[in-house]
């Protein structure tokens, strides 16, 4: 089937194209949370949130790929950190969460860019070839636990750190990459079902829809070097716009768990 598709001129998805898909899915999901806050059970609303599950695993995958291909890890990490800081204010404004962490909750206290930043550090810690200093296995594990702890209060909690590392360590084995992500997210689903909402907890399994997109990833960055900046700029900007829309529609009301 794949060969037939490629013979018809389809060369697969570039990294930039995957980012566009993630942007679309993410925007749909965030707009839905802004316009229809809470956990509505209308089928069309659930479908929107299900499509939105494509965004996070695509980000994890692209962090792993970006780390693999980057020629300057320090600049790569600096870019992630800068936008993690900017995205914190945009994310919390978007969903009506206090800008001061842990003021009202320990969940969803900052955006997913923060654990993505920590994920990149985790990749470096476990990369014996690129890392400039030696580490024993127990030291790697200890650092990973610290990274997970730091990521815990974020959107998607510590799972971006764990899933990104799993994706990178199994690079080239798509089946293992995806099934490993699903295994990790199973723990996230359990927490959702027990503490928040069963239906929306089960929707988190929707990350599996990333499988065909990863399958047809062609390993290229794609046209437009500006995309490495556009994704982060768009991420921050769309959150600010969603926050303004939230104020217009619902006044100063929190629209997700964490506020």
Model-assigned labels for residue ranges:
Residues 1-259:
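Alpha-helical transmembrane segments and their immediate juxtamembrane cytosolic regions
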